[in-house]
Amino acid sequence: MGKDSHYSSKKDRVFVRGMQGQYSLREELARLRAMPRVIKGREMKFVDGPQSFSKHFVEPVDGLTQTLHVHLEEYAPGGRTQKHGHVNEAAFYILDGRGYEVHDGVRYDWQAGDVAIVHNNCVHQHFNASPHKPARALVIKTKPMYMFMNMLFQKQVEPRPTEPAAGPEAAAFGARETETDFNH
């Protein structure tokens, strides 16, 4: 980007394009009120793997909410995610385990009880620091709002690992599908 690019300049910009369409608030409220209010996590399955797994509770495609995307991430012992970036922000509430993030080349350590914030347009990757225990995070994103405004952009920089992480715990690890006690 050059010296005069919008990225680094103080030029006036339009951040939100004009939006229009057929929209009845009464019909939309009726549709939303007819949607389920409780998502049964036990009935959902993890996807992805073998080093990081996701269970998507609320996704843009569901039409359940207008502004939120909520999912559970589980990282295998020593596991890592793909390296990627996106315009929407994300908050990771660490449920259990310990690990770290790398955001734009800077490492940030976390443990259970912490909240990791991924800012807009940040290239990031998530890592489980323990070679023996899994880690979990509840993730809340503003992705549907960006989709609605036609401003969503996401890019993968490094793909998701296709092989388990090193070590016997990681090689044998599968997402905890059958867990019944969620009080960690």
What kind of region is each of these model predictions?
Residues P77, N88-G99, D104:
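Glycine- and acidic-residue-biased ligand/ion/polar-headgroup-sensing regions
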Residues G105-N121:
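Short acidic-glycine-tyrosine-enriched beta hairpin
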Residues V87, V106, C122-V123, K143:
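A generic "binding-loop/recognition-motif" signal
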Residues T81-H84, E101-V102, V118, H124-P131, ...:
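Short beta-strand His + acidic residue motifs that chelate non-heme Fe in jelly-roll/DSBH
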Residues T67-V70, A91-Y93, I117-V118, H132-M151:
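A short hydrophobic beta-strand segment most commonly corresponding to one strand
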